[in-house]
A protein has these predicted regions:
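Terminal, non-globular segments
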Residues: 1-171
Length: 171
């Protein structure tokens, strides 16, 4: 599928669905206190199928949804926006230069993207309890890693195997 309004609508619907699932289930699912960040996972995986501009928009949109759901007043709203936008932009830059779309690539992209986004967030909005924060970030990265493959296959089925700007067909 080429870059079209339908592609943008599909990506927006995927982010909206991820936001609904994040709001409904993320707080009730826990692994040693760590919780998944489905919006970040979805935006990172969708960025694998997008160029730089679309990936940055995906990161910003996912961060805006996430911050609207989870950020209390005066608690890093802007830092969430900036950190997610930068990381998704970086993944979008890699799309053309470094890899072909693959579920084997999605796992490290999501894990390292989660770590990068959370470290940037921490740099912009430092918090007390560094060890507790680091533990939660690592657990979130593990959760997001578990969600990477299903998210990848779902987005790939929705968008097709091709990347942004390429016609349908083989890569």
């Amino acid at each position: 599928m080429s870059s079209s309004p339908w592609r943008g609508i599909k990506l927006a619907l995927v982010l909206f669905l991820a936001a609904i699932l994040q709001a409904a289930f993320a707080n009730s699912v826990s692994l040693w206190g760590g919780r998944p960040d489905l919006l970040l996972t979805t935006s990172l995986v969708a960025s694998m199928f997008s160029g730089e501009g679309t990936a940055a928009l995906l990161g910003f949109s996912a961060a805006l949804l996430h911050a609207s759901i989870a950020a209390p007043p005066h608690a890093g709203f802007g830092s969430i926006l900036v950190s997610r936008t930068i990381v998704c932009f970086g993944v979008g830059c890699l799309e053309e230069r470094m890899y072909r779309d693959s579920v084997l690539v999605a796992l490290p992209i999501v894990i390292f993207g989660t770590l990068a986004a959370e470290c940037l967030f921490f740099a912009f909005y430092p918090q007390h309890g560094l060890l507790h924060w680091a533990r939660m970030v690592l657990l979130t990265a593990v959760w997001n890693g578990f969600l990477a493959a299903p998210c990848y296959y779902g987005i790939r089925a929705l968008l097709g195997a091709n990347r942004e700007g390429q016609p349908n067909g083989k890569l």
